[in-house]
Amino acid sequence: MSDMRLIVAGAGGRMGRTLIHALHEADGAALVGALEAPGSELLGQDSGLLAGLGPNGIPVSADLWSLSKDADGIIDFTVPAATIANVAIAAERGIVHVIGTTGLSASDNAVIKSVTSRAIVVQSGNMSLGVNLLAALVKQVAKSLDEDFDIEILEMHHRAKIDAPSGTAYLLGQAAADGRGVPLEEKSVRSRDGFTGARGRGDIGFATLRGGTVTGEHSVIFAGPYERIELTHRAEDRMIFARGAVKAACWARGRKPGLYSMADVLGLGSQS
């Protein structure tokens, strides 16, 4: 089979540049388009030079419709508004859409789900093998321990991250809620300030830290009577997310239309 031809959305961002590197090194996949927002000062620049590689002859463009004419898929780590705009075009073109964008609202996710009857979408708050294995472990531990064990999720990222809690924190929270058989939206506690009263039994708490250049750290804490279990993942390089996203795109090629997760890609079974 020929290389999968991929577009990188948000080509000038941290993840976009890392994805261009990943595709430069990848077997079975190749970069054919680099997408940025209309009006970006990066438009027209060589995407290889932008990523710190040599020139690759692929200029940054704002026209996804034209780029997608000769592509098999798009990898999208952007912002919610851009991702939702890209969803419609990717579905119309019939190309795979890998979504790593975080901070999506319930209505955004509804839009994404609405196209999956005719489009192939892989969506995850985290594309790394380690985090998705962690989510599977969290689900199992939450299922095994009753509400005598309180669940808290602690995450830390670099100072420039604009959404909180992280998409990975939500993924882990969902895994914990699934293990307990409860709706996350009813049990999640995302802020504590002032006189909050005692912790609610069965709550799933989230705590957020921001600072420095931290790529990503997540811990899920099960705090029980006189003992505590902590499951932790530390990301040391964004390349783990980029390689996971490329793997997801290649895996999705030729699949039936639908909404898939990294658990599907990695053969871990459904986490929902």
Swiss-Prot record:
Pathway: Amino-acid biosynthesis; L-lysine biosynthesis via DAP pathway; (S)-tetrahydrodipicolinate from L-aspartate: step 4/4. Keywords: Amino-acid biosynthesis, Cytoplasm, Diaminopimelate biosynthesis, Lysine biosynthesis, NAD, NADP, Oxidoreductase. GO terms for biological process: diaminopimelate biosynthetic process; lysine biosynthetic process via diaminopimelate. GO terms for molecular function: 4-hydroxy-tetrahydrodipicolinate reductase; NAD binding; NADP binding; oxidoreductase activity, acting on CH or CH2 groups, NAD or NADP as acceptor. (S)-2,3,4,5-tetrahydrodipicolinate binds at H158, G167, T168. InterPro entries: DapB_C, DapB_N, DapB_N_CS, DHDPR_bac, NAD(P)-bd_dom_sf. The active site is at H157, K161. It is found in: Cytoplasm. The keyword Cytoplasm applies. Pfam families: DapB_C (PF05173), DapB_N (PF01113). Catalyzes the conversion of 4-hydroxy-tetrahydrodipicolinate (HTPA) to tetrahydrodipicolinate. This is 4-hydroxy-tetrahydrodipicolinate reductase. It comes from Afipia carboxidovorans (strain ATCC 49405 / DSM 1227 / KCTC 32145 / OM5).
